[in-house]
A protein has these predicted regions:
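Low-complexity, glycine/serine/proline-rich disordered segments
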Residues: 1-29
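A short beta-strand-turn-helix
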Residues: 21-38, 76-82
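Local sequence-structure signature of Cys/Sec-based thiol-disulfide redox active-site neighborhoods
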Residues: 28-64, 147-164
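Thiol-based oxidoreductase modules, predominantly thioredoxin-like and allied folds used
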Residues: 42-44, 63-78
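Structural micro-motif
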Residues: 82-92, 198-200
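A short Gly-Trp-Pro
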Residues: 121-240
Length: 240
């Protein structure tokens, strides 16, 4: 962190959290971390190759709606932390200022999103779909909400990255959200031979969660991406 031109306030890395000067050091304001769910990444004062790797692989690409902030181990005043913070990075998952759980050391994107999934989704249908290759019930509540949204984008429920566009949505009468294509580069395909069937699974590139399957019976010879609504969130166009 560096001193601002007026000697006053220095913003923390893209989090919007402001630092106020106290004595000879800048101390972060931890009040926002005491409200709701937050992710805190502990980094050292000096160079940390695995901290840099975590930023490059995970946090710089994270766009989810649970705030992610950075702190030094000496800047955790007012927070209830259980995990030792001598190893860096240490990733903490907080709720109302208290640690729910934490991890010492580097997490791969897959490990981070598995932890985030448990933190955000808990023991829910969305978690089962995302991480256990589950399937929404036909015409589930989320489907009924999302089938007639205004113009916009469906995003990954964990990473916040765009996945599908309402312009590519169509009514398949299948009971699941259906699209003719994903947002370019947002998903990848994987063979799925479970339950004695040959299908093509669709997974999110950013978080690696299970999204659904793609079939060849879409309108006018196009594909039909059959997608579980519980692992999506919706953002009106212009809000991504």
């Amino acid at each position: 962190l560096g001193k601002g031109k007026g000697g006053g306030i220095v913003p923390e890395h893209s989090t919007g959290v402001k630092f106020v000067r106290g004595g000879n050091q800048f101390k972060p304001d931890n009040k926002p971390l005491k409200v709701g769910k937050n992710i805190v990444v502990i980094e050292p004062e000096g160079f940390c190759p695995y901290c840099n790797k975590f930023r490059e692989d995970v946090s710089n690409n994270y766009a989810g709606n649970i705030p992610l902030s950075y702190r030094k181990a000496s800047n955790l005043e007012g927070l209830s932390i259980k995990t030792p913070t001598w190893a860096t990075p240490t990733i903490l998952f907080l709720e109302n200022g208290s640690e729910v759980f934490g991890y010492q050391g580097y997490l791969t994107p897959k490990e981070f999103y598995k932890a985030l999934g448990f933190f955000k989704l808990g023991d829910s249908e969305a978690y089962r779909v995302a991480f256990n290759e589950g399937t929404d019930a036909r015409f589930c509540k989320e489907y009924e909400i999302f089938k007639n949204t205004p113009d916009g984008i469906f995003i990954d429920k964990l990473s916040g990255k765009p996945l599908f566009d309402t312009r590519d949505r169509f009514v398949s009468r299948s009971g699941w959200l259906s699209f003719t294509r994903p947002v370019e580069g947002s998903v990848y395909e994987k063979p799925d031979n479970s339950y004695g069937m040959r299908r093509t699974e669709i997974r999110s590139v950013s978080s690696d969660i299970h999204l659904g399957h793609v079939f060849d019976d879409g309108p006018k010879g196009m594909p039909r991406y059959c997608i579980n609504a519980t692992v999506l969130e919706f953002v009106p166009r212009g809000g991504v």
